[in-house]
């Protein structure tokens, strides 16, 4: 059987792994085995956190909407309920952007939501107390 020399392939493989692990701390950026292990973990974290980022942004949008809504004397929950009742279809991302960049438009949306809400939410649906 012929002898297989893999020096160039192995060097190239190690070089690419070490290049990708540049910026890691300590041995993880200098030793091939440690760098390879860290790279596998890094890819796992990146995959996981790309999905987690979506939830984090939603939390941020809700916080911004709630802060702007409370400045207009309504809670986030009642605002969303009122917008749904009024048939206003605006997602949380755009609602947060409006709250930050255009407070007058957000105030108009709050007024629409307040108008669509019933007076007493806890009252039975057939009779108003």
UniProtKB/Swiss-Prot annotation:
Family label: Belongs to the bacterial ribosomal protein bL20 family.
Gene3D superfamilies, per the entry: 6.10.160.10, Ribosomal protein L20
Keywords noted in UniProt: Ribonucleoprotein, Ribosomal protein, RNA-binding, rRNA-binding
Organism in which the protein naturally occurs: Mycolicibacterium vanbaalenii (strain DSM 7251 / JCM 13017 / BCRC 16820 / KCTC 9966 / NRRL B-24157 / PYR-1) (Mycobacterium vanbaalenii)
Biological process per Gene Ontology, one example term: translation
Superkingdom of the organism of origin: Bacteria
UniProt function note: Binds directly to 23S ribosomal RNA and is necessary for the in vitro assembly process of the 50S ribosomal subunit. It is not involved in the protein synthesizing functions of that subunit.
Cysteines joined through disulfide linkages: none
Record's keyword annotation contains Ribonucleoprotein: yes
Name of the molecule in the record: Large ribosomal subunit protein bL20
Coiled-coil regions listed in the entry: none
Annotated Gene Ontology cellular component terms: ribonucleoprotein complex; ribosome
Gene Ontology terms, MF aspect: rRNA binding; structural constituent of ribosome
């Amino acid at each position: 059987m012929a002898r297989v020399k893999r020096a160039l392939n192995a060097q190239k493989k190690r070089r690419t792994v070490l290049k990708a692990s540049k910026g890691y701390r300590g041995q993880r950026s200098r030793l091939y085995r440690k760098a390879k292990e860290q790279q596998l973990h890094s890819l796992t974290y990146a995959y996981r956190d790309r999905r987690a980022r979506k939830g984090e942004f939603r939390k941020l949008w809700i916080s911004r909407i709630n802060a702007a809504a409370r400045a207009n004397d309504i809670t986030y929950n009642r605002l969303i309920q009122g917008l749904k009742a009024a048939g206003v279809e605006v997602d949380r991302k755009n609602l947060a952007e409006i709250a930050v960049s255009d407070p007058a438009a957000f105030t108009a949306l709050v007024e629409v939501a307040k108008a669509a809400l019933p007076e007493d939410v806890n009252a039975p649906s057939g009779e108003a107390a």
